[in-house]
Amino acid sequence: MTIPEKPQGVIWTDAQWQSIYATGQDVLVAAAAGSGKTAVLVERIIQKILRDGIDVDRLLVVTFTNLSAREMKHRVDQRIQEASIADPANAHLKNQRIKIHQAQISTLHSFCLKLIQQHYDVLNIDPNFRTSSEAENILLLEQTIDEVIEQHYDILDPAFIELTEQLSSDRSDDQFRMIIKQLYFFSVANPNPTNWLDQLVTPYEEEAQQAQLIQILTDLSKVFITAAYDALNKAYDLFSMMDGVDKHLAVIEDERRLMGRVLEGGFIDIPYLTGHEFGARLPNITAKIKEANEMMVDALKDAKLQYKKYKSLIDKVKSDYFSREADDLKADMQQLAPRVKYLARIVKDVMSEFNRKKRSKNILDFSDYEHFALQILTNEDGSPSEIAESYRQHFQEILVDEYQDTNRVQEKILSCIKTGDEHNGNLFMVGDVKQSIYKFRQADPSLFIEKYQRFTIDGDGTGRRMDLSQNFRSRKEVLSTTNYIFKHMMDEQVGEVNYDESAQLYYGAPYDESDHPVNLKVLIEADQEHSDLTGSEQEAHFIVEQVKDILEHQKVYDMKTRSYRSATYKDIVILERSFGQARNLQQAFKNEDIPFHVNSREGYFEQTEVRLALSFLRAIDNPLQDIYLVGLMRSVIYQFKEDELAQIRILSPNDDYFYQSIVNYINDEAADAILVDKLKMFLSDIQSYQQYSKDHPVYQLIDKFYNDHYVIQYFSGLIGGRGRRANLYGLFNKAIEFENSSFRGLYQFIRFIDELIERGKDFGEENVVGPNDNVVRMMTIHSSKGLEFPFVIYSGLSKDFNKRDLKQPVILNQQFGLGMDYFDVDKEMAFPSLASVAYRAVAEKELVSEEMRLVYVALTRAKEQLYLIGRVKNDKSLLELEQLSISGEHIAVNERLTSPNPFHLIYSILSKHQSASIPDDLKFEKDIAQVEDSSRPNVNISIIYFEDVSTETILDNDEYRSVNQLETMQNGNEDVKAQIKHQLDYQYPYVNDTKKPSKQSVSELKRQYETEESGTSYERVRQYRIGFSTYERPKFLSEQGKRKANEIGTLMHTVMQHLPFKKERISEVELHQYIDGLIDKHIIEADAKKDIRMDEIMTFINSELYSIIAEAEQVYRELPFVVNQALVDQLPQGDEDVSIIQGMIDLIFVKDGVHYFVDYKTDAFNRRRGMTDEEIGTQLKNKYKIQMKYYQNTLQTILNKEVKGYLYFFKFGTLQL
């Protein structure tokens, strides 16, 4: 069917129009970010219904997520309703209103499930099957692996013994089990898992495949060797500019001869490379050269730098790719073959037994969905079954969204139900391989790439390819800068895609013509002398400053009204690779009172509160695990100090487990009695929880732990309290889900959690903030995919790529299989094998490529403005990045492959055209004006030193404040002196009014009202004169002797004023240390200690009120205030006979948005015979009712917020008002 002619005035671009109507062959639409992909997909579905008369239930629409499926179905339904209203007599449209509910617009998993439900008889399974929970599936697989390994231990095949010696330690086979699980998940992502496993051994047995691996390494080596040769030649050229360096030139000449031999004939001579030494040491530099002119000194530095680069590149090739002779590598492969074959056998046994267990329980998992669907749709020979043919007849078109995230099993399923070949098929695919960022979920971007390269624009003889390149989301500055970065960063070699004219973004949004350049901010860290903050904390602080700047100066353009509005919090998103920076950002935003939310369902198990709960569970399950036992002891729950742990271990240094050391310490007569009591209480708790766990489900054990130690309350009061609370509840809810499976017990639950951690699965914070809440958001790049924001701050650019998987002894790859290091069992030594070296190199290339795609996703989220935040320790590293080598239009391949982080690439690309000091051979273009508008960068690069812009509040960690900490004024500033003298000599013009007493204390008002309420006929005193008596130095600060009750009261208040609230209860020993600190600071006299009522303070420390204050979000001590009494009493503002109230509140704290005040009382009271505590409490409340009411009203007047209060009596306890 031909594409209809596009009418004038339609909203669709030519490419979109063709994507909507193209038919008659398989179609692949490469839809760049912001190009309207979803709108095109919906319109294509609608036109199939309206124009072609196809029923909606005869289309199969496959989406990546259930949410996308629901949104897609809703959009289609809305369009059908609109069309039906416009044409009410259309019977076809009325029919679609009914059929939309049966329409197959879903994820592929949902389609597979429906297929199984309809054809379960083919599979010979019970139709009453259910889908296993995540907990049940994980634990069942763990159990299966355990049983299969145990069976093979009984067999003790020599290959199995070698495997266990290579992949297990003397204490654990965890690594061995992990590799089995990884191989299982890799295998089931293939249409025929057994066949994939059988082929793992092929490279180890067949020389032809080994030759292919050698070629992979040779090709990679050529990249680095060529770069090394270039660096060597540059070093030679630079040394040639100098005098007195003949010896240096001779050394380099020798190196050039060696390198010429390696590169002879355009091929890499690997035997020659591995058989010779390279990188001879250069002679020492003479003083004459060092003292030459500045240009020569710079040339010398550059020459040495280039020679050093040459050596490092050669070393990389020899150490990473060819550390051993090729023949030795091949010999190792032959010895590894039996181990690889046996490992595949174990995985097949696991697969078979796992499937048997699932069938016995009548459960299916998501992998079963796909493989059972394939079983239904294919015959034994792999050809489509009769059922597949019936689906081919039924579905008139198959539409696949996010095709770049498809795996090979899903591709096979689609091929079974589509009609025709590529040149006459009915498969419509939409996606963007530049946004393929789910390789960890076994997504295979090569499926998209292969089709994109095979399909043509006109579709002659094959499928048809279309490019949606016009972006309707972002300003042109964002697009052109993004294009410039990727034009020089991404190609087929690194990135897997050529970022050419068809791949780049073209401006299509109707913004105004104002200039909004991209901002690359490079933060130079302050060292410890200039800031107490870590580098990450400095970056978080700097990000907050950027947010404040956006809110103050930036506007958001409304395309519909063509007008601007002020930026709000929700317009701003902070994107990072992971959530490692979340807590620092939360603290930084909290310090500035900016609403901030971490949109996190990742990084869950890294959170402090979750680690504490898991340490508790692990210690209860097995207290012989030192890491978790000690972690629990050091936590806020038990508060053991490092020196206490040291005392315990020193007494029994040879114990295998710390638990043994604890028991031995308790039983030692020389042990510290206080520490022994603390340890006994700790062990008593452990044993009590262990007993409880035997008779109660895990979720009840977690709940008891939370309640016993106020865990929820404590973490709710910290930074990010809502999220922390959600995390703790998330663990509790997961335990409930676990109990609903067929597994029970603490041990099994911990295994379930360990499996989630290992697989990178998260179930973290609940969504405590809605999409329309006005807060600044932080999210990962993965979670931002598909979203857009006016202002994007892409930070964490300097955080290195996570290459942890590359260091494993076994490397897995969907295309190549398994690369296992060689392990010499006799010598107990491991060496890289040919397969592990080659697959590791391939994996590193794929990792860097995916990281590039993550950068692309991050940059293309921005609508109005994009901020890139990098951080370095010093500016010297920037010069090295500016001089990064290039090759043609790209950063050199070797530089890209070894780039440690995104900043390394982004800065080196964007800085080249802005630096005048960079030679032409290191620039992409001599004149940036020559670059086309669509890829000409519009970027401001700012180098910022943190100490120059920091407005951080320097917090004194000292708990104490001394009365004599005064600053001295420096001499020499006469203007300042004159200003101060003028202020001191100033005569107040209304001096007579000062004789009118107008200031009253809250305590005085209390006495006045007590007089009035007692019935005294005295007229209310409106003027209370504060006497002119000299204030004496308190006796507890001066003379020794017996103190009066009021002096002791003042002393107690002083102690309480400085009492630390460290979110934990301090011990009596720590209290004495704290009092001694007050004495050392001269806040109280040494002899005052005997009059401090330690028992009463300890009672307060152990009270609930102390715990509440410790968990507060903010705490203020000894807060003075002065307020107009008219406001407090709600008197008319014109009343001139109104006084000013002044007072001092002992303590204020903020918890859950509510302000509380605390007033300490040292009063004694009369307990009449028979009086209950409740009656005494009422009496005390009444006594201070007036004063407390004024405190409450005053604070509410000042803060304009709800205020509550507490009275604390040292001789009675807490009273809440």
Swiss-Prot record:
Gene (UniProt): addA
Domain UvrD-like helicase ATP-binding: from-to ranges: 10-475
Intrachain disulfide bonds: none
Naturally occurring in which organism (per UniProt): Staphylococcus aureus (strain bovine RF122 / ET3-1)
Function comment: The heterodimer acts as both an ATP-dependent DNA helicase and an ATP-dependent, dual-direction single-stranded exonuclease. Recognizes the chi site generating a DNA molecule suitable for the initiation of homologous recombination. The AddA nuclease domain is required for chi fragment generation; this subunit has the helicase and 3' -> 5' nuclease activities.
Gene Ontology CC terms: cytosol; DNA helicase complex
Catalytic activity: Couples ATP hydrolysis with the unwinding of duplex DNA by translocating in the 3'-5' direction; ATP + H2O = ADP + phosphate + H(+)
UvrD-like helicase C-terminal domain span: 491-786
A Pfam family reported for this protein in Swiss-Prot or TrEMBL: UvrD-helicase
Name this polypeptide is given: ATP-dependent helicase/nuclease subunit A
Quaternary structure (record): Heterodimer of AddA and AddB/RexB.
Entry's Gene Ontology BP terms: double-strand break repair via homologous recombination
Cofactors (names): Mg(2+)
SUPFAM superfamilies xref list: P-loop containing nucleoside triphosphate hydrolases, Restriction endonuclease-like
NCBIfam families the UniProt entry points to: addA_Gpos (TIGR02785)
Keyword set, alphabetical order: ATP-binding, DNA damage, DNA repair, DNA-binding, Exonuclease, Helicase, Hydrolase, Isomerase, Nuclease, Nucleotide-binding
Binding positions for ATP per the UniProt entry: 31-38
